[in-house]
Amino acid sequence: MSEIFDVNAAIYPFPARPVPLDTNEKAFYREKIKTLLKQRDAVLVAHYYTDPEIQALAEETGGCVADSLEMARFGNNHPASTLLVAGVRFMGETAKILNPEKKVLMPTLNAECSLDLGCPVDEFTAFCDSHPDRTVVVYANTSAAVKAKADWVVTSSIAVELIEHLDSLGEKIIWAPDRHLGSYVQKKSGADVLCWQGACIVHDEFKTQALARMKALYPDAAVLVHPESPQAVVDMADAVGSTSQLIQAAKTLPQKTLIVATDRGIFYKMQQACPDKELFEAPTAGEGATCRSCAHCPWMAMNGLRAIAEGLEQGGVMHKIHVDEELRQQALIPLNRMLDFANQLKLQVKGNA
């Protein structure tokens, strides 16, 4: 059984695109960031969906490129006292939850996520309170406040296994916030899942008819899909998985042409993993609609070179992540529960959006 809690779909205002830098400006800010990282005893951790030049700089300076949970775990193991998180705000919060002793900075605290915005804590708390018999499972793409209300936090790479486990115990589930991932998990597990009606503004735009036309142009191509995409798109996939799972699939699939339905920021690491393969973005327009995100998160795009330099240089309330200690402790409980479960399964937890 799968039900949908239907809230009004929101159209979120996108941030202004960063002013493009010329070649000299890019070189200036790259060198400035390298200097500031050393001066601030900081390490740059970047999400797969940031722009390629940011991912390259993270690797060049000894940082990492990963999903949000792995970014936080990398920061925990790194000796630097400061983490500069290039991503969206919930990723900075997750890093702070897992690394309370470290300073966590972001290029901007205004880099949002539609899944986070679409799950306000007051409304979600009321929803959970109206279904007290259900176990609350929230995706990593949520605020610290929402995580603190959950029994479990989960990433896309372990979602099916966790829901199957809870279903085997006879538990009924509240799933939040992504309706497409919730539907995918319910279909795979057969569990009783009540879904919050959120969606990723990037993955929600992938279209089946346009994808079918593209597949007709490249009949030998494999289709790789993130499960935050609509179910009809997922059904067309040769491989479905989290960010890290899609990169692994790109390496192992025999096809030399890949159509990829996720944020195009992933192409930087995916092309590294399989330099001999040709990658295409899955279409996000068609069927009477134009794209808004066009396969790239507008909030991820806020993590530019100038913004990173300003975050390191200025710090302060405009860039520093703060999570109340009581809230942090509450959010840490479901996060640790997931990590312990994963260790029991001997699975490596990676792969929220």
Curated annotation (Swiss-Prot):
Binding site for iminosuccinate: 47, 68, 139-141, 156, 226-228, 243
Involved pathway(s): Cofactor biosynthesis; NAD(+) biosynthesis; quinolinate from iminoaspartate: step 1/1
Catalytic activities: iminosuccinate + dihydroxyacetone phosphate = quinolinate + phosphate + 2 H2O + H(+)
Location (main, coarse): cytoplasm
GO cellular component, as recorded: cytosol
Compartments (UniProt record): Cytoplasm
GO terms assigned for molecular function: 4 iron, 4 sulfur cluster binding; metal ion binding; quinolinate synthetase A activity
Binding positions ([4Fe-4S] cluster): 113, 200, 297
Keyword set, alphabetical order: 4Fe-4S, Cytoplasm, Iron, Iron-sulfur, Metal-binding, Pyridine nucleotide biosynthesis, Transferase
Gene Ontology biological process terms in this record: 'de novo' NAD biosynthetic process from L-aspartate
Function: Catalyzes the condensation of iminoaspartate with dihydroxyacetone phosphate to form quinolinate.
Family: Belongs to the quinolinate synthase family. Type 1 subfamily.
Name of the protein: Quinolinate synthase
Gene assigned in the entry: nadA
